[in-house]
UniProtKB/Swiss-Prot annotation:
Residues 230-270, 306-338, 534-570, 654-709, 1181-1216, 1322-1387, 1440-1505, 1565-1596 are annotated as: Disordered. Its EC number is 2.3.2.27. Residues 1373-1387, 1445-1470 have a biased composition (Polar residues). Residues 534-544 have a biased composition (Low complexity). Changing residue 1689 to R: In BC; uncertain significance. This is Breast cancer type 1 susceptibility protein.
Length: 1863
């Protein structure tokens, strides 16, 4: 060294002194996340929190023994800067001196080792692509990479030495030295560490890395932040409250159990490094590699123990390691070294190489060919040497190595290893597949242990090998990732023969050749179990890209032999490394996602592995099938399919579902790889093939998951599997959310930087919607990307989207138009779906779907993570977040649907769900041709769906046919209904996810375009989608009781995003957790909450018209595509994502993104808001959602029906498939709608819900795009309905003709019933459209009666729906109601059919009478002016009402809108649009107009729906007209409030008026609340009563009543609405008041829109109130106005407050002056509590219990200042004079401005009010009496009188006046 030892020592002493100063007194290490106490002592945050958590009582400062509390802790940013600078100094010191700085004083050793290693490694790394790395670093980190490297290296070394060396140097200084030397390189990592927490760091972290990493994270806030999220993501279990906490924990754990923490560290590091750590990673991975070999062994040992502590992981890993060691001892040893290198180097190197790869991804392969060969030879030698050393090392070392490897790679490998452990004969196969993981792990472990044995040799071999391996690996892995991700199995196959082949293959990966796939397929065929296992492992690993590649390679290697394995293992590790690098490089979050997935896999590994092992062969087949499909050789795919059992395939589906996230990760990684390789931009086809590959991989991945799932075929195992799966998915989602959050950030940056553009496109291919939003922020490109992924041709997509739009107008046209580009794919998909040969293509498409879904979900998670931590992201971000959340929740929802179906109708619903989901996925993926695919698919898919083997494809195919097929298949497959249904549910789950995600994608995709058009409109909808999805995710997850654990974890996972929704979700969870019935309830609830889930799951459920569903979705997709309007998309998403409503609250209020808490706080609220918001944000969306909601309820009914009779649904579905074909004639159907009313109505009713949702979307489309879309879609919907209801048409017609008799049938066939009823209602609607309001009302009445009997259940459900919709706001209650209804659906429906049916019938009769009266009134109020439209609305509303109070409302609104669109809109689009526009344009007017619409739609629900529709349409129109986000937000807010208030309230009201009749005023209140514009006033009341109603049979009855009322009202009211909203509203109000004279003041209050102000609250409390207001759609203003209804005061426990201006004005105005506790308690109870109990009783001045506010509120007719003339004279403080004057005016006084203006005369008493202390002149106010004869009093007289609301005597307030001496 140039520096003398003395100088170095001096510097070191200075640094040591500085370090001691900056040491935490508790942990004696550099402070991480410094926090200062009140006594100004600095500690690590984690240490302090640990200290505080240890003691129950007050904790004492360790230094001064003063009491400390968590609140007293304050972050010390300056101190953290000092620590960071110290770390930089240390890094610089290390770089300058070549010494590792730690506690160690072994600088000589370190110097010697480090220079050599640094030289070797640096040279090698440089040769491999160090420049690229630098470029990468420069790209990702604009900072000077060298400096960062240096400083970070020093930091890392320091950190490593500081912590690692302290702990581990003591253990093994040499290792530490090695590590440190490497660590100096890894200083780079440190730099990247914050960004990267790079592999080196990881390894540092793994060795001592946690601490180091933590310090490193301390090093930079970025690191800390990234690491924090990553740690959070990875170490969900470690729950990183702060980096320091986690880091400290991890550091200590790393020391104790480095592996565990290292695993998280690795993930964290991987995520963070993202592309930053290229240089550092290269240096560091070498260093860390060496360290890993030695230190890692220790760390791994500790980590192994730690892992042991990790229950499932520890065991599975331990077993794995043991087994893997035994099985793959020799193989592993080489592989381990590679892996260690890969882990140490690889993570860094992967990143480096990926980075290198990105720039040089294509060239490096050529250059890497030689290195790869060299690497292979060196690997062989090293492997041999390691094998020998491994034997010497023994199990401990090997375990250590294994532990570490496992920590990193084993996360994935654990699962695979578990599979290995659990498989016997298939264990070999599994070992080939899983064992490669194990081999990777074991090999890495062995490498570590061997490295521990001989660090020098390890260093030499490892360094050289790593460098070579890393470099080839990187490019090779890139190939592998690209090809390997797509063609991982072929790669594995090819990898055996030649790495060069792989490289070559990899280059063509972008344009994957059939040969590759065929080879892969052949390999799969040859060693199907092996390959499948490999594929499975690969899939999972692919999820964790490096692992997938590695496992694939390892699998190949194992398959080839140990010798081959040596190369393959290196290849694997390299591939893994490369994959990791690619992933890390493009997206460190991706790595983190992978790692998280790995961790998730690890945590879930035991169960999954067992399952996988058990069904590894079959899974392998499924995997192979998937792979083949994705790969492209249809023949091979077919063979594979044939080889796979249908149940296996189903399992595969299930698995595919599960791995969707992994797939997403893979796809993200693939996207990144394309970004890296820059292949995507150049080769859309390549991308498409890649996407297919990705699809294959996702499927493989899915297959892996299904493999595991399949293995746990037993129900318990399934549950276990499902639970692990869900937790795993949840974790993945959660982690991915966090990671993806990082990724989301990174994607934006990367995408912006162009790195991600490829990735984005690729991601878009797979799941790029989020990424696309990030990149495009809602631009066509994003749509293009989305559709690219959908269609697989990014470049063509924008046009495709357009063509899709056009095509959507004409579904067939869309099919053909969109099919231009898509059709090749679409038809390939569609027909392949239809045909087995094409099945592979379809599979690839479905894989695309799943890939899209997976990546979309991944991106979604990224976005969602981002959403959570960056709620105010730009619109694109918001949309991204929304989409992400949508996708995320979509995933959960998919899980939920499977859960739901597991609970309720696992077999049929799940299958159908799958089918629905898949088609939707296809639709979404196809994004336009999905319509084609789905339309044709149902029939074609029927063919495939018949084939269990095709099941994966079939799921999409099943949409129409899956009901029939799935029912048999399900029954056949469901012979183990619990086992397979979970598989199906999983599949459904995944499919739902995909579908939802795809819909979301489309939504997002289209949302982006509209976003451009509409500004934030899309984003809000996306946000709302996200929110709702979250809610729905949770609800769905919670919904499945068998999957309750799964649900629990999902909920937990979603909980992070949904915790805010958590309150109601928790209720749901609680309910779900309590009983399975509640589970179903939750499911149904979720159906309500998540109509989309239901639609998706229940489209399967509603298998009657899954085709309609499909069409609905297609329409939705079409509509969305056609419109590209966020509303339509919202509708699509919302429809697919019932959660959309809640989301829409968010959507409507991006604040809800911020206020996820709001949504979370009040899921019911969020849901209500969401539904209402959905209505608000996009009226059509909400309508669509409402109609979807109804549809889900219809589906719920169908679900019941499924339970009762799935066959009927099957026939329904068959009808649907045929219907799909007829869909193209929708316009004809539309025109012939009235003619076809009976059959159409039935179908329409079935489709009504779907179609209505579609129609809502369509209406939005028609509003947005044109009436044509609406008509087409209406026609489509109607056609679907007709087709769909064709069978039911008879019933519907019968119902129509003999509603009562059909009622029984409907009752018997609730599932059919609901659609029929819906159909009938729609028929009636149509008929009433044609015939008129009267007929509509009569039919509605009869239909209502029908409903009363047949729909009684449905009505109860509808009531549930209504209440759910209303209670969607109520959330828990709604959920409870829904769950009650749901659980009661099967059992209660029977009860309902008996007891409640009679009650409902009676109520319906009463309702009919009431409706007749209402009709008369409404007709008087102008339903006549626009008879056709009103009748249309009335009919649709009435029919919809009949169908479902809310459902019918939604549908009514939709149909009304549709009909408005079709008729009025088509005829007079301006009228409807104007109406809607008025509603939306007048957000404020919207209240009135909404009421008007309400009124116009006499049925509040219909009117609300109309209103909603109008609102959403007007929102669309308005947004179209006023795309500005502000307007949208205004509309959303106003509409949200008004719609939710009047809308939901209207819905509740109309439907609730009867309910109120039944149940009394509370409902009436809510009804009135609905009636009233003031949703804020009683949304909670609404919801609560609604829930009560839902829970109560009377509520069902009332619901039935409501529909009639609604129908009658809607029949007349729509005309009124169109004619005069005011007249309609008045008529409605009059009729309502007549009907419900019992409406209380509270109801009246609810009728008024609630508006509140707050006084005396802290910002936190204000935010809580704000959330509360948002949830309950209360207007929250800063100033009190005449519209203000509530003044929220900060009070003490006795409701005593300080006197403020708002307090006085509130009392003077007779407002509700309530305590802040009203808000808090309402939030706690998830409903708006009665204000009476929280009214302010007094104030600190006038008395603590003077009851002034109550007196004022109840005495507004007796004004205290009546007859007084008051002149407020002179200056006043604390209160403007005009406010004081307004106050006295409010109290009945007349204000006089001037003293000379007093009126002289009898009966008027003038008073002059002054504030003496405000006068600057001492006696100025004493002379007032000279100017007038009035008494002069102080202002206190006014204030006291107002506060007490009693006119006080003037005597005590009089100011003595100077006598008039001049007289």
């Amino acid at each position: 060294m140039d520096l003398s030892a003395l100088r170095v020592e001096e510097v070191q002493n200075v640094i040591n002194a500085m370090q001691k100063i900056l040491e935490c007194p508790i942990c004696l290490e550099l402070i991480k996340e410094p926090v200062s106490t009140k006594c100004d002592h600095i500690f690590c945050k984690f240490c302090m929190l640990k200290l505080l958590n240890q003691k129950k009582g007050p904790s004492q400062c360790p230094l001064c023994k003063n009491d400390i509390t968590k609140r007293s802790l304050q972050e010390s940013t300056r101190f953290s800067q000092l620590v960071e600078e110290l770390l930089k100094i240390i890094c610089a010191f290390q770089l300058d001196t070549g010494l590792e700085y730690a506690n160690s004083y072994n600088f000589a050793k370190k110097e010697n080792n480090s220079p050599e290693h640094l030289k070797d490694e640096v040279s090698i790394i440089q040769s491999m692509g160090y420049r690229n790395r630098a470029k990468r670093l420069l790209q990702s980190e604009p900072e000077n990479p060298s400096l960062q490297e240096t400083s970070l290296s020093v930091q890392l070394s320091n950190l490593g030495t500081v912590r690692t060396l302290r702990t581990k140097q003591r253990i093994q200084p040499q290792k530490t030295s090695v590590y440190i030397e490497l660590g100096s390189d890894s200083s780079e990592d440190t730099v990247n560490k914050a960004t990267y927490c790079s592999v080196g760091d990881q390894e540092l972290l793994q060795i001592t890395p946690q601490g180091t990493r933590d310090e490193i994270s301390l090093d930079s806030a970025k690191k800390a932040a990234c690491e924090f999220s990553e740690t959070d993501v990875t170490n969900t279990e470690h729950h990183q409250p702060s980096n320091n906490d986690l880091n400290t924990t991890e550091k200590r754990a790393a020391e104790r159990h480095p592996e565990k923490y290292q695993g998280s560290s690795v993930s964290n590091l991987h995520v963070e490094p993202c592309g930053t750590n290229t240089h550092a990673s290269s240096l560091q991975h070498e260093n860390s590699s060496l360290l890993l070999t030695k230190d890692r062994m220790n760390v791994e040992k500790a980590e192994f123990c730690n892992k042991s502590k990790q229950p499932g992981l520890a065991r599975s890993q331990h077993n794995r390691w043991a087994g893997s060691k035994e099985t793959c001892n020799d193989r592993r040893t080489p592989s381990t070294e590679k892996k260690v290198d890969l882990n140490a180097d690889p993570l860094c190197e992967r990143k480096e190489w990926n980075k290198q790869k990105l720039p040089c991804s294509e060239n490096p392969r050529d250059t890497e060919d030689v290195p790869w060969i060299t690497l292979n030879s060196s690997i062989q030698k090293v492997n041999e040497w390691f094998s020998r050393s491994d034997e010497l090392l023994g199990s401990d070392d090997s375990h250590d190595g294994e532990s570490e490897s496992n920590a990193k790679v084993a996360d994935v490998l654990d699962v695979l290893n578990e599979v290995d452990e659990y498989s016997g004969s298939s264990e070999k196969i599994d070992l080939l597949a899983s064992d490669p993981h194990e081999a990777l792990i074991c090999k890495s472990e062995r490498v570590h242990s061997k490295s521990v044995e001989s660090n020098i040799e390890d260093k030499i071999f490892g360094k050289t090998y790593r460098k070579k391996a890393s470099l080839p690996n990187l490019s090779h892995v890139t190939e592998n990732l690209i090809i390997g991700a797509f063609v991982t199995e072929p790669q594995i196959i090819q990898e055996r023969p030649l790495t060069n082949k792989l490289k070559r293959k990899r280059r063509p990966t972008s344009g994957l050749h059939p040969e590759d796939f065929i080879k892969k397929a052949d390999l799969a065929v040859q060693k199907t179990p092996e390959m499948i296992n490999q594929g499975t492992n690969q899939t999972e690993q692919n999820g964790q890209v490096m692992n997938i590649t590695n496992s694939g390679h390892e699998n190949k290697t194992k398959g080839d032999s140990i010798q081959n394995e040596k190369n393959p293992n290196p290849i694997e590790s390299l591939e893994k490394e490369s994959a990791f690098k690619t992933k890390a490089e493009p997206i460190s979050s991706s790595i983190s996602n992978m790692e998280l997935e790995l961790n998730i896999h690890n945590s879930k590994a035991p169960k999954k592995n067992r399952l996988r092992r058990k069904s590894s062969t079959r899974h392998i087949h499924a995997l192979e099938l998937v792979v083949s499909r994705n790969l492209s050789p249809p023949n091979c795919t077919e063979l594979q399919i044939d080889s796979c059992s249908s149940s296996e395939e189903i399992k595969k589906k299930k698995y595919n579902q599960m791995p969707v996230r992994h797939s997403r990760n893979l796809q993200l990684m693939e996207g990144k790889e394309p970004a890296t390789g820059a292949k995507k931009s150049n080769k859309p086809n390549e991308q498409t093939s890649k996407r297919h590959d990705s699809d294959t991989f996702p499927e493989l991945k899915l297959t892996n998951a299904p493999g595991s799932f399949t293995k746990c075929s037993n129900t318990s195992e399934l549950k276990e599997f499902v639970n692990p799966s869900l937790p795993r998915e949840e974790k993945e989602e959660k982690l991915e959310t966090v990671k993806v959050s990082n990724n989301a950030e990174d994607p934006k940056d990367l995408m912006l930087s162009g790195e991600r553009v490829l990735q984005t496109e690729r991601s878009v291919e797979s799941s790029s919607i989020s990424l696309v939003p990030g990149t495009d922020y809602g631009t066509q490109e994003s749509i293009s990307l989305l559709e690219v992924s959908t269609l697989g041709k990014a470049k063509t997509e924008p046009n495709k989207c357009v063509s899709q739009c056009a095509a959507f107008e004409n579904p067939k046209g869309l099919i053909h138009g969109c099919s231009k580009d898509n059709r090749n794919d679409t038809e390939g998909f569609k027909y392949p779906l239809g045909h087995e040969v094409n099945h592979s293509r379809e599979t690839s498409i479905e894989m695309e779907e799943s890939e899209l879904d997976a990546q979309y979900l991944q991106n979604t998670f990224k976005v969602s993570k981002r959403q959570s931590f960056a709620p105010f992201s730009n619109p694109g971000n918001a949309e991204e977040e929304c989409a992400t959340f949508s996708a995320h929740s979509g995933s959960l929802k998919k899980q939920s649907p499977k859960v739901t179906f597991e609970c309720e109708q696992k077999e049929e619903n799940q299958g159908k769900n799958e089918s629905n989901i898949k088609p939707v996925q296809t639709v979404n993926i196809t994004a336009g041709f999905p319509v084609v695919g789905q339309k044709d698919k149902p029939v074609d898919n029927a063919k495939c769906s018949i084939k269990g083997g095709s099941r994966f494809c079939l799921s999409s195919q099943f949409r129409g046919n899956e009901t029939g097929l799935i029912t048999p298949n399900k029954h056949g497959l469901l012979q183990n209904p619990y086992r397979i249904p979970p598989l199906f549910p999983i599949k459904s789950f995944v499919k739902t996810k995909c579908k939802k995600n795809l819909l979301e994608e489309n939504f997002e995709e289209h949302s982006m375009s509209p976003e451009r058009e509409m500004g934030n409109e899309n984003i809000p909808s996306t946000v709302s989608t996200i929110s709702r999805n979250n809610i729905r995710e949770n609800v769905f997850k919670e919904a499945s009781s068998s999957n309750i654990n799964e649900v629990g974890s999902s909920t937990n996972e979603v909980g992070s995003s949904i915790n805010e929704i958590g309150s109601s979700d928790e209720n749901i969870q609680a309910e779900l957790g309590r009983n399975r019935g509640p589970k179903l309830n939750a499911m149904l609830r979720l159906g309500v909450l998540q109509p989309e889930v239901y639609k998706q799951s229940l489209p399967g459920s509603n298998c009657k018209h899954p085709e309609i569903k499909k069409q609905e979705y297609e329409e939705v997709v079409q509509t969305v595509n056609t419109d590209f309007s966020p509303y339509l998309i919202s509708d699509n998403l919302e429809q697919p994502m019932g959660s959309s409503h809640a989301s829409q609250v968010c959507s409507e209020t991006p604040d809800d993104l911020l206020d996820d808490g709001e949504i979370k706080e009040d899921t019911s609220f969020a849901e209500n808001d969401i539904k209402e918001s959905s209505a608000v944000f996009s009226k059509s969306v909400q309508k669509g959602e409402l109609s979807r909601s109804p549809s889900p309820f219809t589906h719920t009914h169908l679900a019941q029906g499924y339970r009762r009779g799935a066959k009927k649904l099957e026939s329904s579905e068959e009808n649907l498939s045929s219907e799909d074909e007829e869909l193209p004639c929708f316009q004809h159907l539309l025109f012939g709608k009235v003619n076809n009313i009976p059959s159409q109505s039935t179908r329409h009713s079935t489709v009504a819900t779907e179609c209505l949702s579609k129609n809502t979307e369509e209406n939005l489309l028609s509003l947005k795009n044109s009436l044509n879309d609406c008509s087409n879609q209406v026609i489509l919907a109607k056609a679907s309905q007709e087709h769909h209801l064709s069978e039911e048409t008879k019933c519907s017609a019968s119902l129509f003709s003999s509603q009562c008799s059909e009622l029984e049938d409907l009752t018997a066939n609730t599932n059919t019933q609901d659609p029929f009823l819906i159909g009938s209602s729609k028929q009636m609607r149509h008929q009433s459209e044609s015939q008129g309001v009267g007929l509509s009302d009569k039919e509605l009445v009869s239909d209502d009666e029908e409903r009363g009997t047949g729909l009684e259940e449905n009505n109860q459900e509808e009531q549930s729906m209504d209440s759910n919709l209303g209670e969607a706001a109520s959330g828990c209650e709604s959920e409870t109601s829904v769950s009650e209804d749901c659980s009661g659906l099967s059992s209660q429906s029977d009860i309902l059919t008996t007891q409640q049916r009679d009650t409902m019938q009676h109520n319906l009769i009463k309702l009919q009478q009431e409706m007749a009266e209402l009709e008369a009134v409404l007709e008087q109020h102008g339903s006549q002016p626009s008879n056709s439209y009103p009748s249309i609305i009335s009919d649709s509303s009435a029919l919809e009402d009949l169908r479902n109070p809310e459902q019918s409302t939604s549908e009514k609104a939709v149909l009304t809108s549709q009909k408005s669109s079709e008729y009025p809109i088509s005829q007079n689009p301006e009228g409807l649009s104007a109406d809607k526009f008025e509603v939306s344009a007048d957000s404020s007017t919207s209240k009135n107009k909404e009421p008007g619409v309400e009124r116009s739609s006499p049925s509040k629900c219909p009117s609300l729906d109309d209103r909603w529709y109008m609102h959403s349409c007007s929102g669309s129109l308005q947004n179209r007209n006023y795309p500005s986000q502000e307007e949208l937000i205004k509309v959303v807010d106003v509409e949200e409030q008004q719609l939710e208030e009047s809308g939901p309230h209207d819905l509740t009201e109309t439907s609730y008026l009867p309910r109120q009749d039944l149940e009394g005023t509370p409902y009436l209140e809510s009804g009135i609340s609905l009636f009233s514009d003031d949703p804020e006033s009683d949304p909670s009341e609404d919801r609560a009563p609604e829930s009560a109603r839902v829970g109560n049979i009377p509520s069902s009855t009332s619901a039935l009543k409501v529909p009639q009322l609604k129908v009658a009202e809607s029949a007349q009211s729509p005309a009124a609405a169109h004619t005069t909203d005011t007249a309609g509203y008045n008529a409605m109000e009059e009729s309502v008041s007549r009907e419900k004279p019992e409406l209380t003041a509270s109801t009246e209050r609810v009728n008024k829109r609630m508006s509140m102000v707050v006084s005396g609250l802290t910002p936190e409390e204000f935010m809580l109130v704000y959330k509360f207001a948002r949830k309950h759609h209360i207007t929250l203003t800063n100033l009190i106005t005449e519209e203000t209804t509530h003044v929220v005061m900060k009070t003490d426990a006795e409701f005593v407050c300080e006197r403020t201006l708002k307090y006085f004005l509130g009392i003077a105005g007779g407002k509700w002056v309530v305590s802040y506790f009203w808000v808090t308690q309402s939030i706690k109870e998830r409903k708006m509590l009665n204000e009476h109990d929280f009214e302010v009783r007094g104030d600190v001045v006038n008395g603590r219990n003077h009851q002034g506010p109550k007196r004022a509120r109840e005495s507004q007719d007796r004004k205290i200042f009546r007859g007084l003339e008051i002149c407020c004279y002179g200056p006043f403080t604390n209160m403007p004079t005009d406010q004081l004057e307004w106050m006295v005016q409010l109290c009945g006084a007349s204000v006089v401005k001037e003293l000379s203006s007093f009126t002289l005369g009898t009966g008027v008493h003038p008073i002059v009010v002054v504030q003496p202390d405000a006068w600057t002149e001492d006696n100025g106010f004493h002379a007032i009496g000279q100017m007038c004869e009035a008494p002069v009093v102080t202002r206190e007289w006014v204030l006291d009188s107002v506060a007490l609301y009693q006119c006080q005597e003037l005597d005590t307030y009089l100011i003595p006046q100077i006598p008039h001496s001049h007289y």
